[in-house]
Regions:
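Short, intrinsically disordered terminal tails adjacent to the first/last structured region
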Residues: 1-19
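Alpha-helical transmembrane segments of integral membrane proteins
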Residues: 14-27, 309-310
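A structural signal for multi-pass alpha-helical bundles of membrane permease subunits
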Residues: 27-310
Length: 310
């Protein structure tokens, strides 16, 4: 009897593992629990305001009154038929040129400091430090620098230039001066992106090229730039978007007056100074569409390289 009971106990099927089912379900749910809060915040603070902005662009809302009337495409017609509203995009050309100069300078410094250079850590900090500063602080520093008789004029006197130049008052120099400030402030971001990308290029490629007698400019042009092309493409997208959405530096330094008014400054003034929130919303929608369109064109012209699957 004892041997029979032992054999029957051994041949009995093991009990079903019901306890393993809940952990397996939790493994499927856990990633969504981690994503829930960021997704809720993203929808609440990004997509809902965008949808509200688009809906406001079809109304004549003044931003204060609870009443708003549907006006259809009238706000968009005003933007494209009133030259004083849409022509301010021309100011962005100065910042667009400055963004390409900024990318070129950042790429140059990243390439130089990626090789064996003395005091590399010091120069990296000097280049990246302006990006850490608050935009308002940067604007006030350069406001003092550019004022008549300010620091820049005093430096020019040391080299023999005795005339006081209206850096912000001269329409021919104001946007050049302001775009130069943006180059100084944002070059550090592109510099860090390029430096990290260059350092990720395999060192074997550098060594093989140097053994073949390639110079550093040749290594830069034929090895480094093709290897970091996705990062360069990202910097171009960020530069174009930044050039079209410039606000704080010209607004603080000149108040966005005259030829220094940008599209974003005009949009803010329409909403909060002239109480034309509907028209300002339409302007913001147009700016969003322009940036998305330029990004799409850029991605089509410079497609992302895909590594072949093995």
């Amino acid at each position: 009897m004892t041997g029979l009971s032992v054999r029957s106990a051994r041949s009995a099927p093991p009990p079903a593992r019901h306890a393993a089912t809940p952990p397996r379900r939790w493994r499927r749910v856990t990633p969504w629990l981690y994503l829930a809060v960021p997704l809720i915040m993203l929808v609440t603070f990004t997509y809902v305001p965008v949808v509200s902005m688009i809906s406001y662009s079809f109304t004549d809302w003044d931003g204060v009154s609870p009443d708003r009337s549907y006006v259809g495409l009238d706000n968009y017609v005003q933007l494209f038929t009133r030259p004083e509203l849409f022509s301010v995009f021309a100011t962005s050309l100065f910042y667009l040129v400055a963004s390409f100069a900024q990318i070129a300078l950042a790429l140059y410094f990243a390439a130089v400091l990626s090789f064996g250079t003395r005091l590399r850590g010091f120069f990296k900090g000097v280049i990246f430090f302006p990006y850490l500063l608050n935009g308002v602080a940067v604007a006030f520093v350069f406001l003092y620098l550019f004022q008549p008789g300010g620091t820049l004029d005093q430096v020019l006197r040391l080299v023999g230039v005795d005339a006081e130049i209206l850096w912000l008052g001269n329409p021919d120099l104001a946007n050049v001066s302001l775009s130069g400030v943006s180059v100084w402030r944002f070059m550090g971001l592109n510099f860090v992106l390029f430096l990290g990308a260059i350092q990720s290029v395999p060192s074997e490629l550098h060594e093989a090229a140097m053994l073949d007698g390639a110079s550093r400019p040749q290594i830069m042009w034929h090895i480094i730039i093709p290897s970091i092309r996705p990062i360069i493409s990202l910097s171009v997208i960020l530069g174009v978007a930044g050039a079209l959405s410039v606000f704080e530096i010209p607004y603080i330094m000149t108040g966005g007056s005259g030829e220094t008014k940008t599209f974003v400054i005009q949009t803010v003034k329409l909403a909060f100074q002239f109480n034309k929130t509907g028209l300002a919303s339409a302007a913001a929608v147009v700016l969003l569409v322009v940036i998305l369109l330029i990004t799409w064109v850029q991605r089509r012209l410079v497609p992302e390289e895909r590594t072949p699957s093995t």
